[in-house]
């Protein structure tokens, strides 16, 4: 259901019932792309067996799904068609087209080609954990997760949703778990990524290794900091948490057995929603106990790995064992 998760804290009221939430999302339902529209987004029923409902509430968790349809117009195809049109212009006018003319011709070609393009859809699942008042969006991409929040805001009319930040930075928790001083619920797994604190910002990635080994632990003492750390949440899940609080590679350890023991598509979907919701609820609770509840002015987190070394590629070392 969710492989990557971005959390958002909510500061406004949430619909009190499944039906109320469904009715509001239905007003922002998905509509296919028009011939001249590059992207169209809206909510769709998350459960195929219940096409009349745009939300499903199970065990204190609301399940929603945003669908986006995108017209695929490759830049290469547009440029090739534009070049042919420019050649026609040169032959007809006996002059080189100016910047304004090129822009106008490009817009004309785009309008001609767009209705003929193929479309593709992407679906993003979101869960609202009622007891924690946290929205979990199943997207690793910040832009994709923010799109879900913006469409929820439009559907609900008023939604104060901000990225999940606690009193102390997530990097502190990564270090504590890595050194064996973290919460007992979080068990060190076999994957991590570290970044140099020096200007070069080189990175080292360890995978499928014992992170408690002295060689790996020494990296933290050699002027490096953790940006990603694999962990196991008790016996329920394993995942990777980064220094911004984003969860990736989420894997529910009991999901296969649960699916085998459940009959019916709706029952399986409800069981999965309850399992994922309960796992995320437990993780949020652990994070809050370890780092303190949301603060009005949370400490600034380290820059994301993607923002480092602008204009150049930092050195990277990946260490993987079988």
Task: Give the positions of each predicted feature.
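Intrinsically disordered, low-complexity, charge-rich terminal extensions
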Residues: 1-322
């Amino acid at each position: 259901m969710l492989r990557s998760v971005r959390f958002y804290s909510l500061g406004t009221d949430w619909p009190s019932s499944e039906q109320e939430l469904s009715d509001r999302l239905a007003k922002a339902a998905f509509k296919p792309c028009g011939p001249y529209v590059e992207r169209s987004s809206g909510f769709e029923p998350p459960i195929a067996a219940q096409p009349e409902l745009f939300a499903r509430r199970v065990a204190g968790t609301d399940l929603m799904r945003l669908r986006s349809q995108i017209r695929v117009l490759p830049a290469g195809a547009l440029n090739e068609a534009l070049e042919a049109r420019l050649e026609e212009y040169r032959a007809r006018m006996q002059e080189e087209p100016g910047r304004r003319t090129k822009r106008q011709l490009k817009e004309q070609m785009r309008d001609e080609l767009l209705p003929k393009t193929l479309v593709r859809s992407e679906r993003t699942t979101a869960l609202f954990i009622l007891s924690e008042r946290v929205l979990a969006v199943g997207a690793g991409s910040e832009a994709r997760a923010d799109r879900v929040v913006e469409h929820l805001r439009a559907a609900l009319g008023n939604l104060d949703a901000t990225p999940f930040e606690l009193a102390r930075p997530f990097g502190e928790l990564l270090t504590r778990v890595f050194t064996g001083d973290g919460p007992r619920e979080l068990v060190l797994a076999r994957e991590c990524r570290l970044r140099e604190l020096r200007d070069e910002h080189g990175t080292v990635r360890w995978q499928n290794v014992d992170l408690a080994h002295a060689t790996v632990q020494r990296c933290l003492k050699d002027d490096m900091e953790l940006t990603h750390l694999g962990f196991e949440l008790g016996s329920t899940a394993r995942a990777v948490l980064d220094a911004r609080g984003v969860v990736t590679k989420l894997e529910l350890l009991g999901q296969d057995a649960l699916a085998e023991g459940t009959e019916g598509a709706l029952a399986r979907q409800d069981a999965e929603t309850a399992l994922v919701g309960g796992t995320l609820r437990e993780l949020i609770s652990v994070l809050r106990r370890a780092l303190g509840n949301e603060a009005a002015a949370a400490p600034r987190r380290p820059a994301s790995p993607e923002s480092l070394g602008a204009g150049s590629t930092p050195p990277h070392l990946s260490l993987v064992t079988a």
